[in-house]
């Protein structure tokens, strides 16, 4: 929260492939009362988008190098939105999930897989603005939903994306390989 306002957050590069403008267009169309959108990050489109989409309910944080501050921002946010058109597996998404944010991301790269099955809301990369225009009021009006999505996101990241879960998976893989007979040369 920012004061008495609920916080929606984008954290990442402000570049074409991140599709931040789709989020800003949807935000402008919906104007979610009682909420702020915080854009954390910098990039080639930062100045242009800030000039075009400047408003009292959009806060332009800029690049944040300090880890403790980034964590505090994530913990203050209720909803994390990642509207990317191109992505691998977003570290920012995993960090938001670990912080207990309700997460909304496109199906670009592995992000859709990470959120599938109830750990978040997955959007198509086609028509992101339209989808967000429908979804933002629901997230604004349903704090019980956002809390549950945040809980499930955190549970998912702790199950699958911690260092220990990756070590365990690697050990299982090695054990499976070692059980098989060596091939003759």
Features from the language model and the residues they span:
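Conserved donor-binding/catalytic core segment of Leloir-type glycosyltransferases
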Residues: 2-18, 24-28
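Nucleotide-activated donor-binding/catalytic signature segment of Leloir-type glycosyltransferases, i.e.
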Residues: 47-65
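Short alpha-helical donor nucleotide-sugar binding micro-motif in glycosyltransferases
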Residues: 72-77
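Aromatic "clamp/platform" in nucleotide-sugar-dependent glycosyltransferases that forms part
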Residues: 85
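Short acidic/histidine- and often glycine-rich active-site loop of Leloir-type glycosyltransferases
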Residues: 94, 107-123
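Short hydrophobic beta-strand element within catalytic cores of glycosyltransferases
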Residues: 102-105
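Conserved acidic donor-binding segment of nucleotide-sugar-dependent glycosyltransferases
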Residues: 117, 121-129, 138-143
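A short, well-ordered alpha-helix in the C-terminal region of glycosyltransferases
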Residues: 145-160, 166-172
């Amino acid at each position: 929260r920012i004061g008495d306002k609920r916080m929606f957050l984008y954290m990442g590069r402000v570049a074409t492939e991140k599709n931040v403008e789709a989020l800003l267009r949807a935000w402008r169309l919906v104007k979610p009362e009682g909420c702020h959108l915080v854009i954390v990050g910098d990039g080639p489109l930062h100045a242009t988008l800030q000039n075009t989409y400047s408003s009292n309910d959009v806060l332009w944080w800029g690049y944040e190098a300090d880890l403790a501050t980034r964590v505090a921002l994530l913990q203050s946010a209720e909803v994390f939105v990642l509207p990317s058109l191109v992505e691998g597996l977003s570290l920012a998404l995993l960090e938001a999930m670990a912080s207990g944010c309700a997460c909304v991301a496109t199906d670009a790269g592995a992000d859709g897989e990470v959120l599938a099955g109830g750990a978040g809301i997955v959007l198509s990369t086609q028509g992101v603005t339209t989808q967000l225009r429908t979804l933002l009021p629901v997230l604004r009006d349903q704090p019980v939903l956002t809390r549950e999505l945040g809980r499930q996101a955190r549970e998912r990241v702790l199950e699958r994306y911690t260092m220990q879960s990756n070590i365990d998976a690697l050990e299982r893989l090695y054990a499976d390989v070692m059980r098989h007979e060596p091939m003759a040369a």
